[in-house]
Regions:
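Histidine-anchored, small-residue-rich loop motif
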Residues: 1-96
Length: 96
């Protein structure tokens, strides 16, 4: 299953009948079990329904950084992103 950014945005936690998805490096994870983190009011709610790769790499919650773009990231930031990717892979099922 592949999701467009528009389709992914429908899984942002605002509809309790739908799961919550976050994408990292183009891979979409079902983070519904982490609803307290990614659901409305959670500390990472801004990532729900989006590809948060750049923001995770930069350890940023800034809307401008919530993007799949890895352009211009430092080696250190890529390493941070890889660590996040490993955490997501270990904790959440891949859906797309």
């Amino acid at each position: 299953m592949e999701l467009t950014p528009q389709q992914l945005s429908q899984y942002n936690g605002t509809d309790p009948s739908k799961p919550i998805y976050v994408a990292v490096k183009g891979r979409v994870y079902d983070v519904t079990t982490g609803k307290s983190f990614y659901g409305p009011g959670g500390p990472y709610a801004m990532f729900a329904g989006k590809d948060a790769s750049r923001a995770l790499a930069k350890m940023s919650k800034n809307d401008d950084d919530i993007s799949p773009s890895l352009d211009g990231l430092s080696d250190k930031e890529i390493g941070v992103l890889n660590d996040w990717e490993n955490k997501f892979q270990a904790k959440y099922p891949v859906v797309a």
